[in-house]
Amino acid sequence: MPLVRVDVLEGRSPDELTEIGDGVHRALVEAIGIPAQDRFQVLSRHQEGRLVFDRHYLGIARTDGVVFVQITMSVGRSLEQKKNLLAAIVRNLAEKPGVRPEDVLINLVEVVKENWSFGHGIAQYAS
């Protein structure tokens, strides 16, 4: 169960934010094989000054169209799967809603399975 956070500036429409969430989810299904119904996302728009980023970090020019994607998921994916996931997210967001590849910043956070609770305060994956 990946938990996805997407953060954008207010200039993006609610429809664009939904399309971004759809593109990230599609990439998770295709690249690392999560079940299609396994969708948990927090999609947020922020006022100017509330989403802070370096417009030229590592020589990559970013605009106000920047999209932050943070995916928290269980450990266990190979480096190849992670690279495929990153590429699929960028490809999907470029297709719809037309996000520039330079504006997609992705952070993968891996946690051990016993750190998840899916309800009732129980660590369902703990053995």
For each predicted feature, which ranges?
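Interaction-mediating elements
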Residues: 1-127
